[in-house]
Amino acid sequence: MEKEMEDKEEFDEGEIEYTSYAGEHHLPLIMSLVDQELSEPYSIFTYRYFVYLWPQLCFLAFHKGKCVGTIVCKMGDHRQTFRGYIAMLVVIKPYRGRGIASELVTRAIKAMMESGCEEVTLEAEVSNKGALALYGRLGFIRAKRLYHYYLNGMDAFRLKLLFPKPRVPQIPSQVQTQQEYETFPRPRVP
């Protein structure tokens, strides 16, 4: 427990600055964080695929100029659904447990909702208790277990967040209107 406290970086929440992906100068920062913290190796082409096609779904967190967290997402059609997907989420260890990951995910979800996504999915290692707890607090459910999903042989949970359907006012059909018209009592004309 003492070691954990020593490893924590001291800062006020207001010192963390969040920004959207703003160009090629952010790419090495994202790559460095993901490469050092996630189990899956990604090529430069994978990173570029996400940040060039969906820069509005990529966010970075900075503390005093140092990149301490990032989220990389995409969106597109999946079966009959327009779906958002969280591909990568990283917060470096000294900054974990302080709300940075929640803020990054919340910003990405908001951008996906505003773009018309109906749901968001992702995969997380079954052993990644921190990630599973984070996504659970944000309303994600475990939709499926994926056996031997990762290159390291670990299983994953597919997590899903469903957005509420927008309420559309019901407009009566022509048939209903005609039926109502025919059954509506009319005044008698003398």
From Swiss-Prot:
Pfam families: Acetyltransf_1. The keyword Phosphoprotein does not apply. InterPro entries: Acyl_CoA_acyltransferase, GNAT_dom, NAA30-like. GO terms for molecular function: protein N-terminal-methionine acetyltransferase activity; protein-N-terminal amino-acid acetyltransferase activity. Its EC number is 2.3.1.256. It catalyses: N-terminal L-methionyl-L-leucyl-[protein] + acetyl-CoA = N-terminal N(alpha)-acetyl-L-methionyl-L-leucyl-[protein] + CoA + H(+); N-terminal L-methionyl-L-isoleucyl-[protein] + acetyl-CoA = N-terminal N(alpha)-acetyl-L-methionyl-L-isoleucyl-[protein] + CoA + H(+); N-terminal L-methionyl-L-phenylalanyl-[protein] + acetyl-CoA = N-terminal N(alpha)-acetyl-L-methionyl-L-phenylalanyl-[protein] + CoA + H(+); N-terminal L-methionyl-L-tryptophyl-[protein] + acetyl-CoA = N-terminal N(alpha)-acetyl-L-methionyl-L-tryptophyl-[protein] + CoA + H(+). Its main location: cytoplasm. It comes from the Eukaryota. Residues 16-164 form the N-acetyltransferase domain. Keywords: Acyltransferase, Cytoplasm, Transferase. Expressed in roots, leaves, flowers and siliques. It is found in: Cytoplasm. One of its GO terms (cellular component) is cytoplasm. Disruption phenotype: Reduced plant size and pale-green leaves due to decreased chlorophyll concentration. Probably required for N-acetylation of some chloroplast precursor proteins and efficient accumulation of thylakoid multiprotein complexes. In yeast, can replace the NatC complex (composed of MAK3, MAK10 and MAK31) by acetylating N termini of endogenous proteins and the N-terminus Met of L-A virus Gag protein. However, the formation of a NatC complex is not required for this function. Belongs to the acetyltransferase family. MAK3 subfamily. This is N-alpha-acetyltransferase MAK3. The lineage of its organism: Eukaryota, Viridiplantae, Streptophyta, Embryophyta, Tracheophyta. The gene is MAK3.
